Amino acid sequence: MKVVNLKQAILQAWKERWSDYQWAINMKKFFPKGATWDILNLAEALLEQAMIGPSPNPLILSYLKYAISSQMVSCSSVLTAISKFDDFSRDLCVQALLDIMDMFCDRLSCHGKAEECIGLCRALLSALHWLLRCTAASAERLQEGLEAGTPAPGEKQLALCLQCLEKTLSSTKNRALLHIAKLEEASSWTAIEHSLLKLGEILANLSNPQLRSQAERCGTLIRSIPSMLSVHSEQLHKTGFPTIHALILLEGTMNLTGEMQPLVEQLMMVKRMQHIPTPLFVLEIWKACFVGLIESPEGTQELKWTAFTYLKIPQVLVKLKKYFHGEKDFTEDVNCAFEFLLKLTPLLDKADQRCNCDCTNFLLQECNKQGLLSEVNFASLVGKRTADRDPQLKSSENANIQPNPGLILRAEPTVTNILKTMDADHSKSPEGLLGVLGHMLSGKSLDLLLAAAAATGKLKSFARKFINLNEFTTHGSGESTKTASVRALLFDISFLMLCHVAQTYGSEVILSESSSGEEVPFFETWMQTCMPEEGKILNPDHPCFRPDSTKVESLVALLNNSSEMKLVQMKWHEACLSISAAILEILNAWENGVLAFESIQKITDNIKGKVCSLAVCAVAWLVAHVRMLGLDEREKSLQMIRQLAGPLYSENTLQFYNERVVIMNSILEHMCADVLQQTATQIKFPSTGVDTMPYWNLLPPKRPIKEVLTDIFAKVLEKGWVDSRSIHILDTLLHMGGVYWFCNNLIKELLKETRKEHTLRAVQLLYSIFCLDMQQVTLVLLGHILPGLLTDSSKWHSLMDPPGTALAKLAVWCALSSYSSHKGQASSRQKKRHREDIEDYVSLFPVEDMQPSKLMRLLSSSDDDANILSSPTDRSMNSSLSASQLHTVNMRDPLNRVLANLFLLISSILGSRTAGPHTQFVQWFMEECVGCLEQDSRGSILQFMPFTTVSELVKVSAMSSPKVVLAITDLSLPLGRQVAAKAIAAL
């Protein structure tokens, strides 16, 4: 008999009662090679014939089972065929189908093309929907049977359905395939969710607890599929997290003016990467704040820390609250953190002793005000702290000294009021404004107000108002002597305040983002061109120091001939710009014997007698001038600086003179610090009793900086946390040695560690140290140091466990942090670096080649192109094609290029025939990437990994899990889903 079609062949086999293997042999004779059985829909044809009657045809079913066992038909074709059966009233047919599914549902596989693997995902999704519908139908029948008094048939079928459902869903591989299918077919997943809800309603009335709990387990497994990548266990066995501690210390010490959002994101990044529970995370923030308060040097730094702790950190926590689901849960976590903090009585007592008050109470009040604590918890915590507090502290508190926390909290609303006052028209009541400014200068008011403004993000606005005021006072027309003196004072106070702000908080705070065409204010011009700063070398012969000669001559005459400075009609900005050239004339006259020392004293008294800003401008030029002089030529210039730095003992000075001189001396001391160290000179500035430059000149003399670096890191590692002083030393070393030197030497120290607990601590500390300039350090680490270690076989031994694991962890943390933040603004402490030692990454990885560099592409292609996937879309896939290219990520960005090249190197290592510690390192690196991911790799560093790396990675035993494959592929792309499906289906 000549067979015409598949249906006839099946019927002939049934009529002639062929055995299953005989059927298979004959089928292969009837249908010669060419079309596959799946294309001919063999599974569907067999099921259709087997399910014609009220009960299934056992012989035809045996053919199907044989076809499944001998892989004549694919799993996906069988699942698709089963899901088309919808007459659930035929018990025996349903049971037969469940038996067939039971044969292979926990060991699905597909070794074909990527499209076939995606087909398996879709078929499994259809089968899951069918199982849910079948379970719901069985449950309804059971209910009807219970009402009729015949529950047995329905109960048996429901048990079989749930058993098959649980077996299918228990496999992580199946759930991973369903995860991909959900992304491929969102509408089908919605149908599954509806079926699950319907099933839940039906089973709610079920009396059998065993079946109900089994159904609940299945429901939980289905609901977990969309979020199967976001489950991370938190570190409950640890109580100290040095990275958070160091990050807070770094921000409080060096970046008070920084925006809050980048800090919030960085803290959340660390919390996620290190899996820190929220209460311990908040506790670590508070601990670091109290340590900062205790160890901060007296004066401005102490006020900065107080503002950081009491004004900025509560606001940071308010922003952090938005990242957590459930506001109530977060307030409970904050309460829990305070409960832990109250157990650290010695720390809190020491802080109270330092600040002369109950520090915790002030903090609790502020958190309560910000809605971070409930009233009940607030009252309970205050009561506990009052009971635990050392009674001697209360008695030793000095009632005459107002504590800094209280002063800072009161200063914050004052800042707002001053900003409003400064908005008024200055010409209407200059005397009233002068009164406000004069009050600001007294005692430590100015530093308090500046710290409060810095911590609340108002300092830039504050500085802008003073620049506008300074600009307003540069000209005077038709003024009386009184008006002229008020104008001179307003100019002087605003100038001194702005200099003080620039030196204390960085010149970035002062600079405006002025659009082209706008006139740059006088103070900004002077600060950028004439003001000495750390790391800024000024040319004393620069045109900015050489103004109009007629103005200079008239100023020299005024200084030399007048008994005191004139005020009326004085253009103070011109005087400030002319003073440098005037000083040069006066110096030359002195050195050539034209002027005697008494005349110089009279001139310097004139310069500083009315407005201190003239003295500041004069010293600014003298500092630049002294740098250029030989050892024997400096004496007179330094003597002139000494003359200008001393106060003037005269009754004929303008208002607030003593207060202005204090600020002037602080400014001059900062200006002269570098040049005095370089010239080994001492100038005694009038002391205020407080070290105005506590973190300056910390490096020990005559010691190689590499020794200093290794020593400081060893001490930090031994202690387990970074203190403020160490942060400043490390920052100086980073400035001095450059990023490559700094990063390379610290990585060498890490690779020397052999104790596991020490390497983990070292990584946590190094990450926080690298935050001094995370972007540049990451470029060096991923672009130079890691490739050097991975490609040089003589260095592979250093990548053994534990230091290798630690380095992989550190590299991933740095990469993730830099990648997540590099689209935002660099922090103020990173922007002010002037560096020539970083290579230009665009020239390192040439930009004309929009793919990653040629060298890396050569490395990544293997001899036998085994990486190339076999479907039509796969064949066209370049071995370096990655999700980042499909997302059209900007490859001109240095970090993107470095990441792309690193992942190509990783791909080549995995595809090479040589295994070693470097291969193990790559595995640890990828494991850490997966461990740190939130939901999927879209937009993370893994988008730079070539798609072909996935098939290489699953060959590594530790990485051959469905969850890992889902994590490392970009499932938002169809190609990413195909790659993931192919890799998972082959596991």
UniProtKB/Swiss-Prot annotation:
Annotated Gene Ontology cellular component terms: core mediator complex; mediator complex; nucleoplasm; nucleus
Keywords of the record: Activator, Nucleus, Phosphoprotein, Repeat, Transcription, Transcription regulation
Motif (LXXLL motif 1): 128-132
One annotated GO molecular function: transcription coactivator activity
Motif LXXLL motif 2, chain ranges: 344-348
Motif stretch (LXXLL motif 5): 786-790
Motif interval(s): LXXLL motif 3: 446-450
InterPro entries: Mediator_Med24
GO biological processes: positive regulation of transcription elongation by RNA polymerase II; positive regulation of transcription initiation by RNA polymerase II; RNA polymerase II preinitiation complex assembly; somatic stem cell population maintenance; transcription by RNA polymerase II
Residue ranges annotated as motif LXXLL motif 4: 555-559
Family indicated by similarity: Belongs to the Mediator complex subunit 24 family.
Function of the protein: Component of the Mediator complex, a coactivator involved in the regulated transcription of nearly all RNA polymerase II-dependent genes. Mediator functions as a bridge to convey information from gene-specific regulatory proteins to the basal RNA polymerase II transcription machinery. Mediator is recruited to promoters by direct interactions with regulatory proteins and serves as a scaffold for the assembly of a functional preinitiation complex with RNA polymerase II and the general transcription factors. Required for basal and activator-dependent transcription.
Subunit and partners: Component of the Mediator complex, which is composed of MED1, MED4, MED6, MED7, MED8, MED9, MED10, MED11, MED12, MED13, MED13L, MED14, MED15, MED16, MED17, MED18, MED19, MED20, MED21, MED22, MED23, MED24, MED25, MED26, MED27, MED29, MED30, MED31, CCNC, CDK8 and CDC2L6/CDK11. The MED12, MED13, CCNC and CDK8 subunits form a distinct module termed the CDK8 module. Mediator containing the CDK8 module is less active than Mediator lacking this module in supporting transcriptional activation.
Protein name as annotated: Mediator of RNA polymerase II transcription subunit 24
Provenance organism: Mus musculus
Gene assigned in the entry: Med24
